[in-house]
C-alpha cells in the first residue's frame, strides 16, 4: 500500500519536478512513511457526501427561519453548482467557483445582480461548512461582492395610480390596488391576509413578512372605503381577504394578482405594472416627504437598512431643491 501511495504522489508531481527532484521526493517519502502503517479507507461516494451536506445545510437554514421559497432557491443554486463542477463540495476550490460563475454569466447572459445573488448563497453554504468543520476554509472568501450598475428603477406617478383606480374592472381589483399602494406590503403578505386581520377602526393590519416576522402596516382612508365596499359585495364565506372572482371563490394567489396588474398595465399603456412597483413607489414617496429612513425600514419590514435605501429613490427635483437650500 505504501508503494502505491508513493507512486500516485510521484505521478502527480511529474510535470512539476525534474528527475533529481523526483528521486529526492521518493527518498523523503520512504523515510517519512517507514514509521507508519498505511491502509486504504473506503470512501463514501462523493455525490452522496455532497447531497448529505447540502441537506444538513438546508435543515440548518430551516431552523433559522428561512422561508420554503428561500430554501428552494438555496437548494437549486447549490445543486446546479455541484452538477456543473462535478466535485464533492469538500474539494471545490476558489478557481472552480470563479470559472463556474464566469461560465454561468456567459451562457445565461445573467445580470451582475443575479451573479452576486448566487455568490451570496454559495458564501452562506461554504461558510456553514467551515463553521461546522466540514472544510478548513471557505473557497468563497476570496470572491468579492460583484459590483452592479446602480440603475434607477421606475415608480408609479400619481397619474398612473389614478388611471389604474379609474379603470379597475371590479371592486376587488380596486381594493387590491389601494392596499398595495397605501401599505407598501409585499404581494406574498397580502395574499395571506384574512378578513379578520383587518382593523378598520385603526386602519391597520398585521402581516407576516419574510422569516415569518410579524409587523403592522397601515392603509389610508381611500383604501379603507374601497376595501369595505369590496367585502360588503362578497357572497362567499371564505375567510381570505381577497378571493378569485369565479366560484368557488378561493383565496387568490400571487400569480393571479400579477396577471391582473400586468393586463391592466397593457390596457392603459403603463410600463412594468407589477406588485413590487407599488412597494417601491411608496418607499420613494415616503422619503420625498421626509419620513425618517428608520421608520420606513420598519414599515417595509426590512432587516437591514441598506435594503431600504435600495428601495427608496429620491427624485432628482428634490435633490435640486435641497442643493439650492443648503448650498446655494
Regions flagged by a language model, labelled:
Residues 43-44, 155, 210-211, 300, ...:
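Catalytic-site neighborhood detector that most strongly recognizes the C-terminal catalytic loop/helix
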Residues 135, 147-151, 158-187, 211-213:
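Basic, Lys/Arg- and aromatic-enriched nucleic-acid-binding interface segment
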Residues 178, 182, 279-302:
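C-terminal catalytic core of tyrosine-transesterase DNA break-rejoin enzymes
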Residues 1-45:
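N-terminal helical hairpins
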Residues 34-44, 51, 55-152:
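N-terminal core-binding DNA-recognition domain of tyrosine recombinases/integrases
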Residues 28-32, 217-218, 313-328:
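DNA/chromatin major-groove-contacting recognition/catalytic segments
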Residues 209-229, 240-260:
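C-terminal catalytic core of Y-nucleophile DNA break-rejoin enzymes
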Residues 180-202:
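Short, charged phosphate-coordinating catalytic segments
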Amino acid at each position: 500500500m505504501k508503494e502505491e501511495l508513493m507512486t500516485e504522489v510521484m505521478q502527480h508531481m511529474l510535470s512539476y519536478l525534474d528527475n533529481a527532484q523526483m528521486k529526492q521526493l521518493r527518498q523523503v517519502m520512504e523515510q517519512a512513511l517507514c514509521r507508519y502503517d498505511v491502509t486504504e479507507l473506503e470512501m463514501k461516494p462523493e455525490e452522496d457526501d455532497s447531497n448529505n451536506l447540502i441537506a444538513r445545510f438546508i435543515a440548518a437554514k430551516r431552523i433559522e427561519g428561512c422561508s420554503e421559497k428561500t430554501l428552494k432557491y438555496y437548494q437549486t443554486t447549490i445543486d446546479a453548482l455541484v452538477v456543473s463542477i462535478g466535485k464533492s463540495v469538500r474539494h471545490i476550490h476558489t478557481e472552480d467557483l470563479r470559472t463556474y460563475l464566469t461560465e454561468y454569466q456567459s451562457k445565461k447572459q445573467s445580470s451582475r445582480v443575479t451573479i452576486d445573488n448566487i455568490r451570496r448563497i454559495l458564501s452562506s453554504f461554504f461558510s456553514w461548512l467551515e463553521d461546522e468543520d466540514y472544510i478548513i476554509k471557505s473557497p468563497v472568501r476570496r470572491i468579492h461582492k460583484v459590483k452592479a450598475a446602480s440603475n434607477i428603477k421606475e415608480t408609479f406617478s400619481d397619474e398612473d395610480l389614478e388611471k389604474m383606480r379609474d379603470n379597475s374592472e371590479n371592486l376587488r381589483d380596486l381594493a387590491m390596488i389601494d392596499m398595495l399602494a397605501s401599505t407598501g406590503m409585499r404581494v406574498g403578505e397580502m395574499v395571506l391576509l384574512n378578513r379578520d386581520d383587518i382593523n378598520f377602526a385603526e386602519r391597520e393590519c398585521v402581516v407576516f413578512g419574510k422569516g415569518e416576522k410579524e409587523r403592522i402596516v397601515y392603509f389610508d382612508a381611500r383604501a379603507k372605503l374601497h376595501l369595505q365596499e369590496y367585502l360588503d359585495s362578497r357572497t362567499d364565506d371564505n375567510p381570505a381577504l381577497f378571493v378569485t372572482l369565479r366560484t368557488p371563490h378561493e383565496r387568490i394567489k400571487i400569480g393571479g394578482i400579477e396577471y391582473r396588474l400586468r393586463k391592466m398595465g397593457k390596457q392603459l399603456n403603463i410600463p412594468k405594472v407589477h406588485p413590487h412597483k407599488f412597494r417601491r413607489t411608496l418607499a420613494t414617496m415616503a422619503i420625498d416627504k421626509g419620513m425618517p429612513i428608520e421608520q420606513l425600514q420598519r414599515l417595509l419590514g426590512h432587516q437591514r437598512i441598506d435594503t431600504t435605501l435600495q428601495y427608496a429613490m429620491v427624485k432628482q427635483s428634490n435633490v435640486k431643491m435641497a442643493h439650492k437650500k443648503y448650498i446655494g
